[in-house]
Amino acid sequence: MGPLKGVKVLDLTSMVSGPVGAMILADQGAEVIKVEPVSGELVRHMAATHNGVNPVFFSCNRGKKSIALDLKSQEGKEILFKLAEDADVFMQNFRPGAIDRMGFGEKVIREINKDIIYLSISGFGNEGPYANSRVYDPVIQALSGATDIQADRDTGRPKMFRIIIADKVTSLTAAQAVSSALYAREKQGISQHIELSMLDSMISFFWPEGMAGIVFAENEVDVRKLQGSQDLIYEAKDRFITAGAVSDSEWQGMCKALEREDLIDDERFATPAGRVSNAQERKEITGAEISKWESEKILARFKACLLYTSPSPRDAHESRMPSSA
């Protein structure tokens, strides 16, 4: 049982951006019915399977029921309309205009069920030069500024996250939006059409600090100079670790743990603002000091000083081993 018990969701989405959002609703107790083509959704066929199911498909669709329909056939259409009669949520992520051409647009579904929450996920929204373009995660990473945020600090070369991130951020946004729409229907008696783009979701996700440099018009700064403070991977004698200090007390604790109390009074690092603006210098100094210690010992010293810290799963020496490929 979960907070969405009794909520029925029709999930016509595919790939990752929609299915993960619907899966979150299922995790919270909703009855989610995944509507797939007769051949099965594409992700089913994109990796090796175990007992007939591949891990990516499973991890995007757990907790759902599934039905295969030929939505071009009259029978398939009638079944979908029947399912929509008592559904609470209808989710789709076809390219703009496609769902209307298929005959299942928001206006059509609302004629069947006036109280339904209708969610449309797209890459770029319904208007603009990219509106009808095909979209996958790397495209959104590039256009949203993610590749700039991830750029190599030395060369400036844009870099991507090594995971699908835009699809999953959109899914989280979609699940939250649907939950809010269900609450609004309960409290205000309104049923909404939620139009959500992957690009909007990503920009909103990155905005608080990733795009802080452009918040104030005519007072922009290059936020990339500040983001280096997040690259807190250090190499101890035997493995990689992460550790950091944000507050004054944490910085003082780090200096003591490293036996570098002289840095406490260093004007460059004496304030939070100073530690951010001089992040690269600070990282180089702390990195050089951490490299003198065995990881277990320095992590224990950091922990005793109440710093946030953790070992990295990958062994430092293992990571330098040549690839056998």
Predicted regions and their residues:
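Residue-level detector of beta-strand structural context in well-folded domains
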Residues: 56-58, 194, 232
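Single conserved hydrophobic/aromatic residue that forms the stacking wall/gate
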Residues: 308-325
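Structural signal for conserved beta-strand scaffold positions within catalytic alpha/beta enzyme cores
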Residues: 11, 34, 68, 120, ...
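Active-site-adjacent beta-strand anchor residues
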Residues: 92, 196, 243-245
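Aromatic-enriched alpha-helical interface/lid elements that frame and gate functional surfaces
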Residues: 225, 229-306, 310
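Substrate-binding/catalytic subdomain of NAD(P)-dependent oxidoreductase enzymes
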Residues: 182-221
